[in-house]
Amino acid sequence: MLLRCIQAENRKLRRSVIWILFLAVPAISAVYGTFNYNMNLGILKNGWYDLWTQYTLFYALFFFAPLIGVYASYLWRLEHLGHNWNLIMTAPVHPFCLFLAKYCVVAKMALLTQGWMLLLFLLGGRFGAGLEGFPPPEIITWLLRGAVGSLAIIALQLLLSLVIRSFALPILLALGGSIVGLLAASKNIGLLWPYALMILGMNSNKTEDVMAGSLIGFFISCLAFTAGFLLLANLILAKRDVKT
């Protein structure tokens, strides 16, 4: 049943305008990052690592979480129209199964977004910044860690879009959460704030790995926040009734 729900959610993305944002938002970060790198060659001497700091300056700190918010709001949009919630609550599928399906689809989109960012980073470094060779393997590790950190954000954004009918408000909350996440990460308390997990995982705006020696705590925090938000979503859906 979960597989069928996932297939239904995937169909919502066909020919969707969401793909324009999928392509454009990381591309904007890439163009800005490459430009900023070239404008500061006098002080940026670490090649691919310094280019990474410029790419993640806006992508990880401000763009990624709102983009996840767009994915989540878009997948809940149909359910919030008219009396579609009544159809869901009376369907032979547990509503939480629908939530999990949306979670899987947004997680897939987040992973694809990270892959697109990696391709942009490679192309921008080779042809835009004139760097030789290929990015160091740590970059791929940081991208994958960022994807893991995004799992808690995905669960939270889907939860917000579940309880908030507005399309834009959860996205604005994601932006605000990212700003607070930046402050939390700078104060070394990022593991206590879900929006900071992706920033920490991506090693955003850093050349040295800030998570060295803290990976266990990072993964525990990701798991705890994700499980907590999923549990809360299940409780909310279990108490939701048909609206007249």
What are these regions (language model features)?
Residues 21-26, 164-182:
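Pore- or pathway-lining transmembrane helices of multi-pass membrane proteins that form conduits
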Residues 1-26:
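Aromatic- and glycine-rich beta-strand/loop motifs that create alpha-glucan
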Residues 1-7, 76-89, 147-170:
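Cytoplasmic juxtamembrane interface segments
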Residues 26-68, 100-167, 204-219:
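Secretory targeting signals
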Residues 78, 91, 122-126, 162, ...:
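Transmembrane helix-loop junction
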Residues 74-107:
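Helix-loop-helix units of permease transmembrane domains in multi-pass membrane transporters
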